[in-house]
Structures are given as structure tokens and as C-alpha cells.
Amino acid sequence: MAANNEDAANYLAADEQFEDEAYDSPSPTTSTSYATSIQSYIREGVEENGRKYPSYGRNLYGLPIDEEEQERNEVQHTKFKLIIGDRLHLAPVRQLPSNILDLGTGSGIWAIEAADKYESAIVTGVDIAPVQPTWIPANCRFEVLDIEDNWMFAENSFDYIHARELIMAIRDWDRLIKQAYDHLRPGAYLELGATYPTPTSDDGSLRPDMYLKEVERLFFEMAEAMNASLHAPTLWKEKMERAGFVDVRQNIFK
């Protein structure tokens, strides 16, 4: 779940209070016009069957981005914290980190709580949908970014990269993990988390003919049709090690 990087990478984008050390340096004019041009249509999204879906990103994303989904996202956040002992993460973040990145930040709740916890750091949450709140800690920011594209951050810049529940969003995990590796400072950590969508029961009471198992089958079928493998978490450790991470640890909870 967490991995240590021996050979790493630089990052950030600042508001007026903070020094920008994380972005590669596009001109201010280019950055501003880009942000303005994408903002109008990505905020609206695409409506389908009464739900709102993202209109930005190179690949189809199968989950909505509306208010109902943001509420589910926050319940999911609470679930993760309870599972790992009321913590935000398992990886050992260095003292006084300066830059933290949250991939696929969703409602932004993890990034906001991380910014409150690590006041020394600028915590940046990125997502294809700008659905995050505007009232946030001064050291927290949100950016629109498709993390399957090239990242616009300088290499060797992050003290910690966090990603959770991205199995419906990522097609090329090798590329994502390698980009994370390249953007981490030496000794920094990447932490990936996901719910493996295969319900089981210790006592055998969950039979193959039950509706819950049918939901599982349809979920996997849908994901495969989108070319998003739900089996990805079982391969993360191997992919991290192949990218160059060391001290890779896998934690399984039920």
C-alpha cells in the first residue's frame, strides 16, 4: 500500500502566500488562458439519466460527479479512516513536509484534512472534475488535471503522494506509478488504496446465486468494457517494485 522511493522528484502551484516550487514553469499568460478555457465546460459536466458525469479527461469515467456522489465520497472517506485506525494514511510522512499531492481528490475531503494536519505543507488535490469546495485551508489548493496525461509538476518535488479508489479511473497503472515515482523526493512515499469489489463471507453464507454476487459480476463486466481492470490492486506491489520503489508494503483489511 505504501512505497519508499530512493531516487526521486519537484512540485507545486502557489497562491500568493506560498512559493511555487512544484510546477514546471509555463508562462502566467498561458496558464491563465488554459484555466479559463477549460473551466466553462468542465464545471457543467454532462448530464445522463438524471446524473452528472465529467466532461473532461482522455478516458471514460464511469461514476457521476454530482452532489449525491460527493456525499458518497465523504462516507467513503470516513470508512477508510475507520479501517486504518482513524488515520489519514499509513505511510510515514516526513516531519514538516512541504508538498503533498492527492490524486483523484474527488470532493477534496482528504486533501482538506491533510492540509489541516500538515500546516507546513501545500496540499494539492487534482481531479478531472472541479467539484471541491472553495472554503478551504490556506495551504490547500485544487487543480483540474487528468492524471493519465503528463503531469505539469516539476520532478523530485513531493514529500508524499496519496491516491484512493481510482480503479474505475486508471487504464495504465504502470504509467501512473512511474509518474508518481518521478515526482517524489528521495525517501518519499506513494500510498494507493482501494476497495476490492469482491464480497465474501467468512461463514460461507454469501452464496454465488445471491444478488450481491450478481452485482459484483455486472460491476466487473462494466469495468472491463471500459478497459478499467478492477483487479489492479492485486498487481500494485509488483508494479511499484518494477517502477523502482523499495520497501513496498501491502496491507489487506476486511
Protein language model annotation of sequence segments:
Residues 148, 157-174:
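A short SAM/SAH-binding and catalytic strip from SAM-dependent methyltransferases
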Residues 115-117, 182, 240-241:
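Short, surface-exposed basic-aromatic patches at helix termini and helix-loop junctions that form
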Residues 122, 130, 162-165, 188:
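Voltage-sensor-like transmembrane helices and their cytoplasmic interface
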Residues 120, 139, 187, 245-247:
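A generic structural signal for alpha->beta connector loops
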Residues 168, 189-254:
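Conserved catalytic/acceptor-binding region of the Class I
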Residues 2-156, 175, 194-206, 211-214, ...:
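N-terminal charged/capping segments associated with class I S-adenosyl-L-methionine
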Residues 174-189:
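A short glycine-rich, Lys/Arg-flanked "PGG" loop and its adjoining helix->strand segment in the class I
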